């Protein structure tokens, strides 16, 4: 998904194209402009504090729409252990416990595309190590809107816990599944 974040997304889209080409995997990219008529940058003017919420909703719609366009029967995302643990903790902090059990793969027309998360039990560190060992590592910029994100603080908190108490993130994910 190309959200249209100037100075950021161009580089990550290019990197994804290179990696998928190298791996022999089909790569499809769809933009917010194509889907919604404008870029995320334009949608956010004056509402930058809401960036992650707005982007998250639109990205999910875009992913489901893209999956339908190419006739996909599953939607694989790159969510890793760190992402999953952060989401669990953020939902707890927000008091949104219903999200801990909700499955969100339905678009506005009600057409379900099952999501799979093959990397959900693999840490960011392990993924980075794999990419480095296989000479596929690319240093990518961080989204400029993360400075407004609760996730940034939760990531820092969880990283500290994981360092001092190895296995924290995995146990957090396992607790959600119980």
Question: What do the predicted segments below correspond to?
Answer:
Residues 1-106, 120-134:
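ATP-dependent adenylation/nucleotidyltransferase module used to activate substrates
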Residues 20, 28, 98-178:
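ATP/NTP-dependent adenylation/nucleotidyl-transfer catalytic domains that generate, transfer
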């Amino acid at each position: 998904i190309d959200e249209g974040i100037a100075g950021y997304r161009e580089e990550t889209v290019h990197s994804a194209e290179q990696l998928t080409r190298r791996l022999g995997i089909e790569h499809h990219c769809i933009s917010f402009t194509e889907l919604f008529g404008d870029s995320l940058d334009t949608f956010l003017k004056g509402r930058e504090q809401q960036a992650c919420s707005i982007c998250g909703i639109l990205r999910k719609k875009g992913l489901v729409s893209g999956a339908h366009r190419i006739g996909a029967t599953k939607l694989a995302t790159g969510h890793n252990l760190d992402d999953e643990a952060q989401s669990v903790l953020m939902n707890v902090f927000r008091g949104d416990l219903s999200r801990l059990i909700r499955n969100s793969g339905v678009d506005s027309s009600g057409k379900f595309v099952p999501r799979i998360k093959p990397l959900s039990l693999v840490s960011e560190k392990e993924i980075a190590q794999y990419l480095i060992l296989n000479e596929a590592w690319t240093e990518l910029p961080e989204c400029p809107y993360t400075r407004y994100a609760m996730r940034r603080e939760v990531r820092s908190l969880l990283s500290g816990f994981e360092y001092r108490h190895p296995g924290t993130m995995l146990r957090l994910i396992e607790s959600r599944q119980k």
